[in-house]
Amino acid sequence: MIHTKTGSGRRILTFPTVEPSESISIVTLLDSLIQLAGDILTFKSKHFSTNKQSFRETLRRIQNLLVVFEEIRIRIRNSRRYFHDSAAASSLKEIHVGFQKLKFLLEDCTRDGARLCMMMNSDQVSDHLRVLTRSISTSLSAFPVASVDLTTEVNELIDLVVRQARKYGVQPETNDKRAVSSINRILALFVNRVVPDPDEINRILDHVGIRKWGDCVKEINFLGEEIDAERLDEKKKKSSDQVELLSSLMGFICYCRCIILGRIERDDHHNHHEDGIKKDHDLIRGLKVEDLLCPISLEIMTDPVVIETGHTYDRSSITKWFGSGNITCPITGKILTSTELVDNVSVRQVIRKHCKTNGIVLAGISRRRKSHDDVVPESLAAKGAGKLIAKFLTSELINGGEEMIYRAVREIRVQTKTSSFNRSCLVKAGAVTPLLKLLSSVDIRIQENAMAGILNLSKHVTGKSKIAGEGLKILVEILNEGAKTETRLYSASALFYLSSVEDYSRLIGENPDAIPGLMNIVKGDDYGDSAKRSALLAVMGLLMQSDNHWRVLAAGAVPILLDLLRSGEISGGLTADCLATLAKLAEYPDGTIGVIRRGGLKLAVKILSSSEDSPVAVKQHCVGLILNLCLNGGRDVVGVLVKNSLVMGSLYTVLSNGEYGGSKKASALIRMIHEFQERKTGSVEPNLQRGRFVHAW
């Protein structure tokens, strides 16, 4: 049997065929043709987005050809002599290639997600179909029917197929032309921000077979993939024109999803989303998030690559590691003979699936390409559609009923997840104020999605100012009293983004419930490591404002973090974050005293001297913590380090790790220890304030 390529990974309207072998037998070739014909006929029950009549007629001819090939196979198998006719073989091989291409074309025109794009390419589709049908009929007419004892009926069937192909040529269909004209007219309206006729849009959607929210999601995903592919195709000089068209179509289908189909369906989009999440959960069941973290940066890898030892790292992290003069594997310490990096495609796909399932947005899943969601639309039509959508959704938030409001906040959450353009449109449309009001909703669905929308809008500059000006109080209330765990975590993340502005960081800190609320997440048993890290990230953001330092200490941060570290049940990423926060607190004398009084120095030394398999970031922040304790604790703290024989060896190990190992801090600690040993003086009063002396150990 001849195996052909599947459609996976194939660009639309490309036909990568496999030529039958020169030595293939006629019977084997006929078997493959019959199987291909059967595969093609399965498309009879599917919806064609374009050239519907032409495809139906073509499938009728394939049905007739299937009868012909089955009859030829029977005749040859029943023949007592070996059958070999070069003309027959050549004819069937050409038909086989034509069938492969036809199958690909059928896949494209019935593909979920590609309906709108294929309809806009209806002229090109009809050209391909015309060429293929003529090629198949020409090859069939060259078949030496005299060499096979066929019945009169079969010979007449062959003549019929050939005559039909010659007489009835494939032409662009009127309905397709009308639909394309309608779309172009609507795109022109979008440019001028004019609301199109919904009835006209519904006629287009009916024509191509898009009737559900989930259908629109598939279309958007496909168009995004095509935009990415066009950008990467450097050979195309006119690629920008195609990107502009695809961007316009994405704007159109987003408009349909939010405004047209949103009115028709009740919760179809929610069910579709939940079903998708369930499938994704099934696919990544048993996955440990730690497996997706770069061993160097302890962050989820955006561009995973494999080095010579077989270990996987994030490209940017391992590149900097090598750039610092290190030619060893960070995990094993093995000296490498090559620093070549190989893409880990499997891990990248798992990371994408994990991020999609958990709503995680990375800066870029691959540094070599931009996500289509994270760029400004590349057409005026798409920009106009985005502004109309934002205006509509904001109006729904203000004037809609409960279900309309729910659909609007859910759509805003999706629209703003990664698109800075959509965030800008919604902020300008005035969506922040009604979203903040909806945080008080008794409907937990509305509250959760409104909070997720606020989180996304907090990444926008103007969004920050509006949220900080109107909603800090309600954000802190949600942080402490949100109906769902996810809602409280969204609030913590929003506070982190707001804390990047100094004035907002001060205002957050002045709220007496903000920092304690974040620390409750860090110490809470109901929260996983990922949630605790999100809360710590917000705390670190607040610590950038010096006025918040004492507030974090007052919230019990030091004992909470030390207890977490002592538990030994947290991930390397959370360990590194705890140490980083303690190091920041220890920059001030009060923080140093708090850490030392609770045995933090001893614990830090223990972590530093632990197994060499500890993540590099853990050791880096551990060194930073010890250094700050020494700077504020004086010679008493340094003296403790001198007494521990393992400290120097651990520091030299960190020093050898280069930039990521905190080499400058390790070098400073080594220098302090050497100076202490060289002086060999008596007891020296520590730098801690009188009356506040604490034992370093």
Swiss-Prot record:
One GO term of the biological process aspect: regulation of stomatal movement
GO terms under cellular component: endomembrane system; membrane
Domain U-box: 287-361
Pathway in which the depicted protein is active: Protein modification; protein ubiquitination
Main subcellular localisation: membrane
Stretch list, region U-box N-terminal domain (UND) required for EXO70B1 binding and crucial for the negative regulation of ABA-dependent stomatal movement: 23-210
Mapped ARM repeat ranges: 420-459, 461-500, 502-544, 546-587, 589-631, 657-696
SMART domains: ARM, Ubox
Pfam family, one: U-box
Keyword Transport (UniProt): no
Stretches of the chain forming a coiled coil according to its record: none
Enzyme class: transferase
Compartment(s) of residence: Endomembrane system
Catalyzed reactions: S-ubiquitinyl-[E2 ubiquitin-conjugating enzyme]-L-cysteine + [acceptor protein]-L-lysine = [E2 ubiquitin-conjugating enzyme]-L-cysteine + N(6)-ubiquitinyl-[acceptor protein]-L-lysine
UniProt keyword Transit peptide, yes or no: no
InterPro entries in alphabetical order: ARM-like, ARM-type_fold, Armadillo, RING-Ubox_PUB, Ubox_domain, Znf_RING/FYVE/PHD
Function: Functions as an E3 ubiquitin ligase. Mediates EXO70B1 ubiquitination. Involved in the regulation of abscisic acid (ABA)-mediated stomatal movements.
Annotated domain remarks: The U-box N-terminal domain (UND) confers binding specificity and subsequent ubiquitination.
Name of the protein in its database record: U-box domain-containing protein 18
Gene encoding the protein: PUB18
